[in-house]
């Protein structure tokens, strides 16, 4: 299985590169961060050209994530919506056949350290790791992200 993760930093700005990547590398699963686009239909129609089904959490101007995969991959979305802060987005899927959970997220930026943004980031991360621990033990977990360290 070929899985690619990319902080695309604007889907529209990187469309030609993304098209080339998909056509050349032929990923089974493609996880993008920082889509910087509000229109979910646009994201899904872009990937439909390549016969990739797509789940996306979008937000205008910044953030946003998507998971796209080949049509024959059996996936189930896990809603971790309580993790969505203003600056954070996530998609989480289970690939039942592979016993694999993929979490693709955009961590909130916590700068500066002595700010409420930093406290919110730490709380968001604690919630994320609690959610991960609550998943089935017989699944492998793959966390893909723009973390903002």
Located regions from the model:
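Conserved small/polar residues in nucleotide/adenosyl-binding loops
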Residues: 147-149
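A structural signal for short, well-ordered beta-strand segments and their strand-loop junctions
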Residues: 31-32, 102-104, 140-145
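Alpha-helical elements of Rossmann-like donor-binding domains used by nucleotide-donor carbohydrate transfer enzymes
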Residues: 17-20, 123, 127, 131
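Surface-exposed cleft-lining segments at the edges of enzyme active sites
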Residues: 81-83, 107-128
């Amino acid at each position: 299985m070929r899985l690619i993760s990319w902080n695309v930093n604007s889907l529209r700005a990187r469309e030609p590169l993304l098209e080339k990547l998909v056509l050349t590398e032929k990923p089974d699963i493609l996880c993008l961060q920082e889509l910087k686009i509000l229109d979910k239909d646009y994201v899904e129609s872009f990937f439909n050209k390549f016969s990739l089904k797509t789940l996306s959490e979008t937000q205008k101007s910044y953030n946003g994530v998507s998971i796209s995969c080949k049509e024959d991959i059996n996936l189930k979305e896990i809603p971790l919506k309580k993790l969505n802060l203003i600056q954070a987005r996530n998609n989480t899927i289970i690939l039942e056949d592979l016993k694999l959970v993929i979490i693709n997220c955009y961590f909130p930026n916590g700068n500066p350290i002595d700010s409420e943004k930093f406290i919110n980031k730490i709380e968001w991360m604690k919630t994320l790791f609690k959610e991960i621990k609550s998943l089935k033990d017989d699944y492998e977990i793959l966390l893909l992200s723009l973390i903002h360290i």
